[in-house]
Design a protein with these regions (language model features):
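C-terminal flanking helix
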Residues: 20, 41, 110, 114, ...
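C-terminal edge and immediately downstream basic/flexible tail or linker adjoining helix-turn-helix-like DNA-binding
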Residues: 2-8, 149-176
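Structural recognition of an alpha-helix C-terminal capping motif at a helix-to-coil junction
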Residues: 35-42, 51-63, 143
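A short pre-motif secondary-structure segment
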Residues: 116-120
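Arg/Lys-rich amphipathic alpha helix in sigma70-family domain 2
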Residues: 52, 59-80, 95, 154
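A short, charge-rich alpha-helical start-of-domain segment used by transcription regulators
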Residues: 1-21, 31-34, 45, 114
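Residues within the DNA-recognition helix of helix-turn-helix
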Residues: 15, 144-147
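Internal acidic/polar
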Residues: 67, 75-106, 126, 172-175
């Protein structure tokens, strides 16, 4: 019996949840994430009959997101020389507490930075693994992570809702 037989099979529900979390990291919108996962799932089941792995689902979701960005032309090029201070939107009243604060802070990141943060801190992947998944050089991934952490710190400290960002949130972004 080899090591591959020892790992439990991932269920469709777990795949969908992981795909949705990844879609949220890319799009930062519940509706777009749901649409991305649904379209990816449909494409994969039509083509292969089933979704074989998380990697295949993530790749399909990412490609669909890139296609949507190209169609909408929402890819923003930002100068890295003198970045503007990020403006953190005030969280909705429907999202009180830490969840709303984290969502607002992640909203200041570019999609590429959110993707790197998602893979590194939520999925527990190394920079090398992220570079293989996204097709970017390892140095670019490290730069994205570094810039994202700096932007999160600045946003958390300069937010008008900084007192709401309680000490847990400040601990999170200062310890990254």
């Amino acid at each position: 019996m080899d090591a591959a037989d020892d790992t439990p099979a991932i269920t469709d529900r777990e795949l969908l949840q992981a795909g949705f979390r990844y879609g949220m990291a890319l799009s930062h919108s519940v509706q777009e994430a749901e649409d991305l996962v649904q379209e990816a799932w449909l494409n994969l089941t039509r083509r292969y009959g089933a979704v074989a792995s998380k990697a295949l689902l993530f790749t399909t979701v990412r490609n669909l997101f890139i296609d949507q960005c190209r169609r909408r032309k929402i890819v923003h090029f930002e100068s890295l020389d003198q970045p503007e201070p990020p403006a953190v939107p005030v969280p909705d009243a429907e999202e009180p507490g830490l969840q709303g604060d984290v969502a607002a802070l992640l909203g200041v990141l570019r999609p590429a930075e959110r993707e790197a943060i998602f893979f590194h801190y939520y999925e527990g992947r190394t920079a090398e693994e992220i570079s293989l998944l996204t097709g970017q050089p390892r140095g670019t991934v490290l730069s994205l992570l570094h810039r994202a952490i700096i932007r999160l710190r600045e946003a958390a400290l300069s937010s008008p809702a900084a007192p709401r960002c309680n000490q847990w949130l400040l601990f999170f972004v200062s310890s990254l």
